[in-house]
């Protein structure tokens, strides 16, 4: 089950718990977080966590709502798991891009 995180302390707590239990953590942004917090904020959060918790297995899913532009920006910034609920044609194009950069696009 994914843990919804909206701050660095929340993400750290979830990863510390996963680290102590020896399991992988599934982190997920709140709905429409790319619009609310910004893609760059979550990209920096992801980079900080990858550095701080280098030995801990985790995924971070950024919810981009129906905004294809934000989903594309998230892929450009290196976020590896994007939630997108927009137009099916946009989803197909984004999925193709995600595959090329080793990322994953998931529906809502």
Mark where each language-model region is.
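Short, charged N-terminal helix-start/capping segments
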Residues: 1-23, 74
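Generic secondary-structure signature for well-ordered alpha-helical cores
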Residues: 19-23, 47-51, 99, 103
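N-terminal active-site wall of soluble small-molecule enzyme domains
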Residues: 29-75
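Hydrophobic faces of well-ordered beta-strands that scaffold small-molecule active sites
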Residues: 1-6, 23-29, 58-64, 81-84, ...
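A short acidic, glycine/proline-enriched capping/turn motif at secondary-structure boundaries
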Residues: 66-69, 81, 89-90
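Active-site-adjacent beta->alpha loops and helix N-cap segments on the catalytic face
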Residues: 9-13, 17, 34-46, 86-100
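Amphipathic protein-protein interaction modules
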Residues: 71-82, 96-104
């Amino acid at each position: 089950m994914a843990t919804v995180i909206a701050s660095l302390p929340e993400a750290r707590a979830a990863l510390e718990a996963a680290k102590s239990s020896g399991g992988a953590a599934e982190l997920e942004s709140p709905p429409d977080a790319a619009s609310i917090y910004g893609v760059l904020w979550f990209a920096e959060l992801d980079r900080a966590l990858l550095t701080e918790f280098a030995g801990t297995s985790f995924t971070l899913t950024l919810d981009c709502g129906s905004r294809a532009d934000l989903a594309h920006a998230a892929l450009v910034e290196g976020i590896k798991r994007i939630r997108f609920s927009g137009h099916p044609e946009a989803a197909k194009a984004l999925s193709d891009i995600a595959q090329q950069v080793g990322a994953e696009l998931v529906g809502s």
